[in-house]
Amino acid sequence: MSRTPHSVMIADIGYGNCKTILLTQAPEGIVERRWMIPSVVVQTRENLSSLGSSNIRKIQVGGTDIYFGPDILDELGGTQSGMRGAGSHYFESSTYRNLVIANLCESGLAVIDELVLTLPLDYYETAAKELKALRGQYEWQENGIFKTTTVVNVSVQPQALGALIHYRVLNANVGFEKSTRAVLDFGGGTLNFLVAQGYAGKKLRSGHVDYGVRSMWEDMAKEISRQIQASGRVAKFENVALIENAARSGRDYVSTAFGDFEMASLLKQTHSRLVEKVTEAARKMGDVSDILEIVLCGGGAAYIEPAVREVFPVQKIVCLPEPFFANANGFAMLSRKQMAGRELAHAE
């Protein structure tokens, strides 16, 4: 940054959810806001069940209606949309750009000095240049009122670097730069992993496995189907959104037309599958004997932790607090220092 920013937005837009932290300068100091919305935007009102939630916003971009917000999945009535069905180049999609606009709208600011976007390491190099071009002025209408936000600068960062910064700030251990650890980010669409010595990522030992929390919900739906059919009924359960909503709400059961199914039992059935996917990630890392710690983050961190402990019995397992926001938190910590005119130690 050429000057101290007065506003920084960190947007970690993943397959499943968009996690955003907004930092602004105020007379009393740096003020922080954070929010999380599903990575789903809807352009047709008919796709929504009622649009009765106050947690859904409607804006017009270029004459097209866009609906987004925390309750968008509930209003979709069990259907899925947006980035949850996108491929590896999701950052090139119109949904990604609309989610950027949705977050700018949510900020309520006329100017964002620095927009920090995060990407999985696999796509960071190819997409960084393209996403930096997202700076400029954005226009939309809401409730008939014309609004704009200008993004002065865009920086693109590897997601796992944020988790490493977060880890480093919370664990001021000696020898961080010389020790090797792996970050496992179990997100909505993929299990991303980064092997790094200090902050230096080892590209050939990093990557992803095509299995995320969404895949886990689908495996749980198959288990529900199996239990239904074992009871003598001919039916197939495919409403994955019911499972996701039960998990998001902290409910002990998934309530369906075929009865209630215990979440703990369903999760237990996914364990062998999670072990299989973590083992696949470990195999791609190569010789893991030099890895001192495994740092867990992402919305599915709690689900995958038992499998990680089984696959990595020797390494210390560190679960970052607020795993959904772990990547964004790291860059927010760094941005706070920059906004205050100070550098974060060892975070070059």
Question: Regions from the language model: what does each represent?
Answer:
Residues 1-181, 200-213, 241-348:
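Nucleotide/phosphate-binding catalytic cleft detector across ATP-hydrolyzing
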Residues 180-248:
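Aromatic-anchored, glycine/proline-accented short structural segments
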